[in-house]
Amino acid sequence: MWLVNHGGEREIIMKYLGAAVSDTGISKRTNQDGVCIKIADTEQHGQIAMCVLCDGMGGLKKGELASATVIRAFIEWFEQQLPWKISGGIWDGLSADWERLVKACNFRILEYGKQEGITLGTTVSAILLMEGHYLIAHVGDSRVYKIAGTVEQLTEDHSFVAREIKRGNMTEEEAENHPQRNVLIQCVGASGIVTPDILHGRTEKGDVYMLCSDGFRHKLSTEEIYEEFRAENIGSAEIMEDKERYLISRVKTRNERDNITVALMKCEE
């Protein structure tokens, strides 16, 4: 089904499948990751879907509080603000909305940390899917991938090693075992100033978007991810969840020590 927007451009009315699994892992006592999926039906725009994934800082106190704070803020935005915002221009202002939302979360968590005398923080990777488009907001080293024929990383890690690789000072092989491989150069709640990456793009029927914490991806190859998560292999939310649990179990057998979280969103017409 198609809809023509005010600018005369054809927009696709899509439906979405989504599923997410989060696991404490084999060594940690608490799960500091957080994830949510929200899908809403609208009369004018078809389904609108949002997925948000956060990884609370494992080395910081109360990381689960930081991740939960950001997840809750995005859910409130989706349920309370998005409905009246889309009654006008579809994408007008949504990017600025998400940037303000992330910065507000950063301020709130920073202030809480000051009051309690602790440091806490979280990554955030969020995607909004609507009418053949996606919007992504990203801070940290959780990731968003697009799976459509290949596995394409859409986000850039805000980490020390990623920055050094980009500058040509380090190889990817060196980064894998570098003592500062887990150091982030910005995260929500532990950085004085946070500047989220905001990304836009078009979606097609059959596109799959994967959000994951670093604990999920460290022990898996892109070939393994593609084989399980390509569109033809995930025909329902139940199958999605089964395959997510299968890969998480594989990661755990490979001695991953972190919390492990993965979410999938599939575009359908």
Identify the residue ranges that each predicted region occupies:
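PP2C/PPM-type serine/threonine phosphatase catalytic domain
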Residues: 2-269
